[in-house]
From Swiss-Prot:
Membrane-spanning ranges: none
An MF annotation (GO) of this entry: rRNA binding
Protein's name according to its UniProt entry: Large ribosomal subunit protein bL21
GO-annotated cellular components: cytoplasm; ribonucleoprotein complex; ribosome
Keyword Ribosomal protein: yes
Species the sequence originates in: Halalkalibacterium halodurans (strain ATCC BAA-125 / DSM 18197 / FERM 7344 / JCM 9153 / C-125) (Bacillus halodurans)
Role summary: This protein binds to 23S rRNA in the presence of protein L20.
Record-stated family: Belongs to the bacterial ribosomal protein bL21 family.
Keyword Protein biosynthesis: no
GO biological process: translation
Length: 102
């Protein structure tokens, strides 16, 4: 069984036991979180929500928080001596999907 959930402005396909990296959540490591915005539940019979499947939820456990690889944002205007270098690391949360309730 699989589900498509909406979190952090993105849609993610999840299955039980899967580890996923999502946008940072306000939850401590080891805490259990519940995703109510389930767009689709698949398996033997597929349930498609409009916009969300009623009564469906996905339970996950927060494993850790972290920051992604550093990316460099470099702005430059030729012949004008304009240079700006800025780094960015996106925060993320690693969760393990425990149960899909459909």
């Amino acid at each position: 069984m699989y589900a498509i959930i909406e979190t952090g402005g993105k849609q993610v396909k999840v299955e039980e036991g899967q580890e996923i990296y999502i946008e940072k959540l306000d939850a401590e490591a080891g805490e259990s979180v519940n995703f109510d915005k389930v767009v689709l539940v698949g398996g033997d019979d597929v349930k498609v929500g409009s916009p969300y499947v009623e009564g469906a939820s996905v339970t996950a456990k927060v494993e850790k928080h972290g920051r992604g690889k550093k990316i460099i944002v470099f702005k430059m205007k030729a012949k004008k001596n304009y240079r700006r270098k800025q780094g960015h690391r996106q925060p993320y949360t690693k969760v393990v999907i425990e149960k899909i309730n459909a």
